[in-house]
């Protein structure tokens, strides 16, 4: 039996053992709701449903979960205090932080990412609002499935010389995404002939840490050119991310404002809940925020940014697709390449999830597929005139 959520790869549930999920939340209502969602999926099970971080720390070695969904605000031991203790006891544990959309919780979520959490998910203020609960369900199951791809256990026949279960890595990307060993074969395009005049970046799962690392390395690019970023992230979280990017880059960074003129020396981040597009205002490049429907199940989405920029910069676009689930950015990347621009994708080994960059690489649109720590230096050279 194959299962998939929209934007997720199909998983043959009969070939893999179910992912073991530990749900840690002080709300019995939330624990019950999430547990029912998980148990309804054939490729995952609830390994434990616990009330506090202390319960999780005391029982994680016995439970042996693959993934922990960890609430931030709990009695006895909260999520941020429990996180390092859980990872110390089970180093391969994948932790997803869960919190409501407050500034304090957004800041704590960013701290959790720096301490080793794999991702975060915003909880709805109330589960009685059906639309909000459905979005939460969709996003949660998608994250579990994609992040769990790295530890999913393939079912094998009993053998005297082999264990029942072998750990295998399954790329959380498009079904045909190539392995790390074959990535060199994907690089088939030369960089576009036009000197880049703008840097566009798209990212999702694992993106905040990747973005902070990248912008810290591209100061010479930011000083001379505008940088526009779409990170899949809700409101409040993008506000905090912009502040972190400003500190990492030591250059101005803020959420894009509708009608704002785009200038070199600044980083513009798509605000949560709005698509960020590029338009012209009085002949000058400007931000246009769009409150339309989600694109690729995301809002903000990368494709609207990528595609809209072509009318302004034509072939002078350098686009980077970083770690993330799904395939957002691939279609926009195709449009950029068709217009004479260039695309770089993060490689699988350095990605938390090789979905978005894998889709771009597999589509044959990339001029380079690089580890994260090589993308910054490459961009500095490219924007300095080195087209090799």
Swiss-Prot record:
What superkingdom heads the lineage?
Answer: Bacteria
Catalytic center at which residues? 204, 232, 328
Q: Which GO terms describe its cellular component?
A: cytoplasm
The CheB-type methylesterase domain extends over 193-386
Give me the reactions it catalyses. Answer: [protein]-L-glutamate 5-O-methyl ester + H2O = L-glutamyl-[protein] + methanol + H(+); L-glutaminyl-[protein] + H2O = L-glutamyl-[protein] + NH4(+)
Which subcellular locations apply to this protein?
Cytoplasm
* Protein's UniProt keywords contain tRNA-binding: no
What PTMs does it carry?
Phosphorylated by CheA. Phosphorylation of the N-terminal regulatory domain activates the methylesterase activity.
Domain comment text? Contains a C-terminal catalytic domain, and an N-terminal region which modulates catalytic activity.
Q: Which family does it belong to?
A: Belongs to the CheB family.
Q: What is this protein called?
A: Protein-glutamate methylesterase/protein-glutamine glutaminase
Q: What is the lineage of its organism?
A: Bacteria, Pseudomonadati, Pseudomonadota, Alphaproteobacteria, Hyphomicrobiales
